[in-house]
A protein has these predicted regions:
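Disulfide-bonded cysteine motifs in exported proteins
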Residues: 20, 49-50
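Residues at the start of alpha-helices and the adjacent loop-to-helix junctions
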Residues: 22, 33-36, 71, 102
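Bacterial N-terminal signal peptides
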Residues: 35-49
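Glycan-processing catalytic domains of CAZymes
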Residues: 58-365
Length: 365
């Protein structure tokens, strides 16, 4: 809109001298007044366009396409994917993650937004619905060589006394069923970095012995890279990299949602560059946060600001990583977590409130 007005301005003033030179002085003064009124009207429209929150909606194609190159054969933009919709324990978003047609449509839509992989929240075989949804997603992705999937292993909190053994069992299942040489043809859809499969870790238990787990995974024929949420001082040698995760920062959750995690992101990226240059750094971008629809809600908010939060979070990433020192991956957090309001599937700007959740509850697709 602004570009259109600017073009009109240029057209007016490029012809102004020539046009006015051909008319009498009195008429010239009247023309000046008319033109002045026209320009003032246009400026008012420009100011109104800038003042309305949704006039500057984020265009993910423009916002995300400017990142540096990814390693050959690896997707650069990944999105966290929640596979639990379609069961009664979660809100109705108008689709089931067990519907192959829905999964194919989501992959196609993600690619339109320059996202080339889903990192699927995965709990191991203990949550059968989510495990089946993961398998269906990997199968759908296998039909498109340009799109990949990976697991974000969500550690359990109900294995007191044998946390490490439980994690080993889960990861062995993941490897055998979806990653390893016996996993079947859909294994080609699994995300790899420099030829090695990537597993993201969402930790829950502090008693898990990740050094022991790493010894086990290194013994596999196709050993994976383990990417941990934030940094781990306790097990620095157990992980190949770290990823940032949506949070408000050191000042915590503000009542007005104004804390969007800027200080946390600055610390994460600076710490990765200064103290972990040998590790894989995975950046993050999020549109906001609102867990009011979740059954576990704690009334936590990060204001969306009609796309401004998304832009600000992305700008912090760009301060530290560009074409000269590209991070291999940037995580969009998330694709479809409507219950915590981090979804970008239907709305990045969330103008007028949590429009993603509202359209989801209405069953829009």
């Amino acid at each position: 809109m602004k570009g259109t007005f600017i073009s009109i301005f240029k057209g007016i003033f490029s012809r102004l001298d020539t046009s006015l030179a051909r008319v009498p002085r009195l008429r010239r003064a009247a023309d000046f007044r008319a033109i002045a009124l026209l320009v003032m009207a246009m400026l008012s429209l420009l100011m109104m366009a800038g003042a309305t929150g949704c006039a500057a909606k984020v265009n993910p194609r423009e916002s995300l396409a400017a990142q540096g190159r990814a390693p050959e054969g690896s997707p650069k933009l990944l999105a966290i994917y929640q596979p639990w919709f379609g069961q009664k324990a979660h809100i109705d978003v108008g689709y089931s993650c067990h519907d192959p047609n829905v999964l194919r449509q989501q992959i196609a839509k993600a690619k339109e937004l320059n996202i080339s992989g889903f990192v699927v929240n995965w709990y191991g075989p203990r949550k059968e619905f989510e495990d089946q949804a993961y398998g269906l997603m990997q199968q759908a992705a296998s039909a498109d060589p340009s799109f990949k999937v990976a697991a974000q292993y969500d550690e359990a909190v109900d294995h007191p006394g044998y946390d490490t053994d439980a994690v080993i069992v889960d990861l062995q299942y993941l490897y055998d069923r979806y990653i390893g040489p016996e996993a079947g043809p859909s294994r080609n859809a699994y995300l790899r970095y420099n030829g090695r499969p990537v597993i993201f870790i969402f930790p829950k238990e502090s008693n898990t012995d990740w050094n022991r787990i790493r010894q086990v995974t290194r013994s596999w024929p196709d050993p994976p890279l383990l990417i941990y949420k934030d940094m781990s001082d306790k097990y620095p040698d157990a992980f190949d990299g770290y990823y940032a995760w949506v949070q408000p920062g050191k000042d915590g959750w503000a009542r007005d949602g104004s804390n969007y995690g800027e200080d946390y992101l600055n610390y994460f990226y600076r710490n990765m560059q200064e103290h972990h240059p040998d590790k894989i750094a995975v950046g993050a971008v999020w549109p906001g946060f609102d867990d009011s629809k979740a059954s576990w809600s704690r009334n936590r908010h990060i204001a969306y600001r009609c796309g401004k939060t998304f832009e600000d979070v992305l700008r912090v990433f760009r301060k530290y990583y560009g074409s000269q020192n590209a991070a291999p991956y940037l995580l969009v957090e998330t694709w479809n977590d409507y219950e915590e309001g981090t979804d970008v599937e239907r709305s990045i700007g969330h103008c007028g409130g949590n429009s993603g959740i509202n359209s989801a509850v209405a069953g829009e697709q």
